């Protein structure tokens, strides 16, 4: 390959609409080769601790992530090297033994709540996007998602949101908004902002030769 890949970081609070924005990017660049990397598959491997102890981990804290591994993988993809991406089991709160082989692509989208927290990771991104959505809407989306897709009970989701998710958002996630190049209010529903963002990505793609 002769072109340098472009890395787009998409962040925001849990339930903000990051996935919708990411899908909009993928749909727009359907003619290009695109790879989406989710930060939450880079939670630390916890096979060495009990399930009960895994439930006590604060998964909205920067230390919950194996950021060094994520950084090394994004850097490798930028060099057009293949990576072995972790596969995370959300019901067991740890990684699976299997890995997913990922080939480099022309556009790499990195999505996650804390991808702008570490400067080393920010420095690997060409465009940094923060999806800004009302707290109540984010909570409802998280509640529905965790119950449907991750086997959680309503009580456990509510308790985690009030005791961990909300305070961690205020302490760690919201402050990273200042590092964003683009702030998108209302997530995937903001078509004007998404159009502006995709235009910028196209401009960078043309220069990455």
Swiss-Prot record:
Entry's EC annotation: 2.7.1.48
Signal peptide region: none
Catalytically driven reaction(s): uridine + ATP = UMP + ADP + H(+); cytidine + ATP = CMP + ADP + H(+)
Family according to the record: Belongs to the uridine kinase family.
Identification of the protein by name: Uridine kinase
Pathway stated in the Swiss-Prot or TrEMBL entry: Pyrimidine metabolism; CTP biosynthesis via salvage pathway; CTP from cytidine: step 1/3; Pyrimidine metabolism; UMP biosynthesis via salvage pathway; UMP from uridine: step 1/1
Keywords (A to Z) from UniProt: ATP-binding, Cytoplasm, Kinase, Nucleotide-binding, Transferase
Entry's Gene Ontology BP terms: CTP salvage; UMP salvage
Pfam families, per database record: PRK
One GO MF term: ATP binding
Gene: udk
Disulfide bonds: none
GO CC annotations, alphabetized: cytoplasm
Domain of life, per lineage: Bacteria
Localization, UniProt: Cytoplasm
Annotated InterPro entries: P-loop_NTPase (IPR027417), PRK/URK (IPR006083), Uridine_kinase (IPR026008), Uridine_kinase-like (IPR000764)
UniProt: ATP binding residues: 12-19
């Amino acid at each position: 390959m002769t072109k340098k890949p472009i890395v787009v970081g998409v962040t925001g609070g849990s339930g903000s609409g990051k996935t919708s924005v990411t899908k909009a990017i993928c749909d727009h660049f359907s003619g290009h080769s695109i790879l989406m990397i989710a930060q939450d598959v880079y939670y630390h491997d916890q096979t060495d601790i009990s399930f009960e102890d895994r439930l006590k981990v604060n998964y909205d804290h920067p230390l919950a992530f194996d950021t060094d591994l994520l950084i090394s993988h994004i850097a490798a993809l930028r060099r057009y090297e293949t990576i072995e991406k972790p596969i995370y089991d959300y019901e067991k709160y740890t990684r699976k033994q299997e890995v997913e082989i990922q080939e480099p692509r022309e556009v790499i989208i990195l999505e996650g709540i804390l991808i702008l927290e570490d400067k080393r990771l920010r420095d690997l991104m060409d465009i940094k996007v923060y999806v800004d959505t009302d707290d109540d809407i984010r909570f409802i989306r998280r509640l529905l998602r965790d119950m449907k897709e991750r086997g959680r009970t309503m009580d456990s989701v509510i308790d985690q949101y009030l005791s961990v998710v909300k305070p961690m958002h205020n302490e760690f996630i919201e402050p990273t908004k200042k590092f964003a190049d683009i702030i998108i209010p209302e997530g995937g529903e903001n078509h004007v902002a998404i159009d502006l963002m995709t235009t910028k990505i196209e401009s960078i793609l043309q220069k990455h030769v």
